[in-house]
Each structure stands twice: as structure tokens, then as C-alpha cells.
């Protein structure tokens, strides 16, 4: 009855497998010697192993003739090995440079971390050991790719650099609170006349009105009998009291410009 699962598998193309090789495989796989399944004369299997896919933890192949370790047999070892499983191949040093040929076959078979060890002085018959590992992912598996995050460049500040205090750039005048002009400080009564020491601008406004010979009512609520007074000087008659003033809308206060009393020359 064919086995389906094994912690470790030892195969050889010879009639018997040295007990020492079985012990080495058990130690490398971290299992007891009794858990190692041994198959001899593997060349008679036709390149097939009686195990399910990904059912063997580790494989030790003791091969006397390199030609018995063909590409088909390498593929079969990869099939029965679990993902991340280890394979050890021991070969006779009598073959001409067998380790290079075996390493190439393992690499072409999809194994990684292929390494060849030095010859063992304790066992001259099987002395060249090549170790490899099956990839840890299965065929058809997928995994998300992590997008690289671009961080902002870090500014290196030299401790010896002299830093300027922003407050030291301000003068005493800059730190003083500005004095706002007093609005409407005239003690006006019902006539709303500017006081003697007017500082709110009412005296200047009254001076402009007196210059025009207009009443406050005509400034604050201008009206036009002909309908052209508010259109500007181009439409006003020669006796219009609003000549020289800007255009306005009837009923809206006339806004006198600040330079109204300034001389043209």
C-alpha cells in the first residue's frame, strides 16, 4: 500500500541505505529516525514517488549514479515536498564534478538556496552533499504588494546654526498699541454743528458745504427739479446749485471727495 504522508523521506538507487545517512536526515529534519520512510532502488520506480503532493517535510537522496537523478525525478521530489521543505542529495565523488551537475538540475527544477558542502572524511563512499530548499509559496498563490510610501524629506538642522528670535526684530514702536482716532467727539446738539476743537471731521464737512453755498438738506437729501442734476456737470444747467459736484442719485447723500477743497494749481 502506497504511503501518502511522511515527515521525512530517504531514497537511494542502491540496494541498501546506510544507517548513518538515515540518522543525518532525521537530525536535519528534526524528527526521530523511526519517522523516516526509506525507499531503495528508486530507479525502478520510473521517476515516480508513492506520495501525495506536498506531503513530505524533507527528502534525502543518496545517489550513486548521477544519471539516475534526472530532471523527471527532480520534478517528482519537488512535487512531494511541502512548501519550504528541504532536500539533501549525497553523491559519490567518483563521478566527474557531480555536484555542479546536480546543483544545475536543482536550480532548473525551481529549488532555491542551493549549496554544496565539502567532502566528508567519515564516509568516503557518499561524501558530496548538496542542500537545497523548495520555495515557500505554492503554484498559483497570490499576495498583496505593499506600496512604497514616500515620506517628506527630513530637514537636518545643525546645532551650531544661529537661530534668530522673531520678537527681537520688532522695535518698541511696533509693540505699541495703535491709537485709533476718536469718532464723533463733537458735543453737538439739535443743530449738529461742529464744536470748536473738532477732531472727528465734522468741521471739514461743514466747510465744504459752506464753500458750495448748499444747505445740509441739499447735501444729505439731494433733489432735482429738472431731473438732470444727478447726472453730472455735462447735463446741468448754468444756474444748477450742484455744479462741480460728482454725480448722485436723488435722495442719497452726496459723497464729497477728500481733495474737494484742494486747489487745482
Swiss-Prot record:
GO cellular component terms attached to this protein's record: cytoplasm; mitochondrial intermembrane space
Keywords: 2Fe-2S, 4Fe-4S, Cytoplasm, Iron, Iron-sulfur, Metal-binding, Mitochondrion
Renumbered ranges of motif Cx2C motif 1: 226-229
SUBUNIT field: Monomer.
Chain ranges for the short sequence motif Cx2C motif 2 as given in the UniProt record: 237-240
Region of interest (Fe-S binding site B), ranges: 226-240
Top-level division of the source organism's lineage: Eukaryota
Main location: cytoplasm
Similarity-based family: Belongs to the anamorsin family.
Name of the molecule in the record: Anamorsin homolog 1
GO-annotated biological processes: iron-sulfur cluster assembly
UniProt subcellular location: Cytoplasm; Mitochondrion intermembrane space
The keyword rRNA processing appears for this protein: no
Molecular function per GO: 2 iron, 2 sulfur cluster binding; 4 iron, 4 sulfur cluster binding; electron transfer activity; metal ion binding
InterPro entries in the cross-refs: Anamorsin, CIAPIN1, SAM-dependent_MTases_sf
HAMAP family from the UniProt entry: Anamorsin
UniProt cofactor(s): [2Fe-2S] cluster; [4Fe-4S] cluster
Region (Fe-S binding site A): 186-200
Region annotated N-terminal SAM-like domain, chain positions: 1-143
Entry annotated with the keyword Cell cycle: no
Gene3D superfamilies in the cross-refs: Vaccinia Virus protein VP39
Region feature Linker, mapped onto this chain: 144-175
Lineage of origin: Eukaryota, Viridiplantae, Streptophyta, Embryophyta, Tracheophyta
Function: Component of the cytosolic iron-sulfur (Fe-S) protein assembly (CIA) machinery. Required for the maturation of extramitochondrial Fe-S proteins. Part of an electron transfer chain functioning in an early step of cytosolic Fe-S biogenesis, facilitating the de novo assembly of a [4Fe-4S] cluster on the cytosolic Fe-S scaffold complex. Electrons are transferred from NADPH via a FAD- and FMN-containing diflavin oxidoreductase.
Amino acid at each position: 500500500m502506497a504511503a501518502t504522508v511522511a515527515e521525512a523521506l530517504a531514497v537511494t538507487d542502491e540496494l541498501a541505505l546506510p544507517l548513518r545517512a538515515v540518522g543525518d536526515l532525521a537530525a536535519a529534519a528534526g524528527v526521530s529516525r523511526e519517522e523516516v520512510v526509506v525507499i531503495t532502488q528508486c530507479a525502478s520506480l520510473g521517476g515516480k514517488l508513492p506520495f501525495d503532493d506536498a506531503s513530505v517535510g524533507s527528502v534525502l537522496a543518496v545517489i550513486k549514479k548521477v544519471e539516475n537523478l534526472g530532471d523527471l525525478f527532480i520534478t517528482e521530489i519537488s512535487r512531494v515536498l511541502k512548501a519550504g521543505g528541504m532536500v539533501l542529495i549525497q553523491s559519490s565523488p567518483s563521478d566527474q564534478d557531480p555536484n555542479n551537475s546536480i546543483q544545475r538540475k536543482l536550480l532548473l527544477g525551481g529549488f532555491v538556496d542551493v549549496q554544496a558542502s565539502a567532502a566528508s572524511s567519515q564516509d568516503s563512499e557518499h561524501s558530496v552533499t548538496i542542500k537545497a530548499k523548495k520555495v515557500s509559496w505554492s503554484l498559483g498563490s497570490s499576495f498583496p504588494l505593499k506600496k512604497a510610501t514616500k515620506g517628506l524629506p527630513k530637514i537636518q538642522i545643525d546645532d551650531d546654526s544661529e537661530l534668530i528670535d522673531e520678537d527681537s526684530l520688532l522695535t518698541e514702536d511696533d509693540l505699541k498699541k495703535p491709537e485709533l482716532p476718536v469718532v464723533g467727539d463733537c458735543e453737538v446738539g439739535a443743530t449738529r454743528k461742529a464744536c470748536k476743537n473738532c477732531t472727528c471731521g465734522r468741521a471739514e464737512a461743514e466747510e465744504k458745504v459752506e464753500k458750495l453755498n448748499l444747505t445740509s438738506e441739499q447735501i444729505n437729501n439731494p433733489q432735482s427739479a429738472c431731473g438732470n442734476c444727478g447726472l453730472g456737470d455735462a447735463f446741468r444747467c448754468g444756474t444748477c446749485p450742484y455744479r462741480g459736484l460728482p454725480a448722485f442719485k436723488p435722495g442719497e447723500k452726496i459723497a464729497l471727495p477728500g481733495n474737494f477743497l484742494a486747489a487745482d494749481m
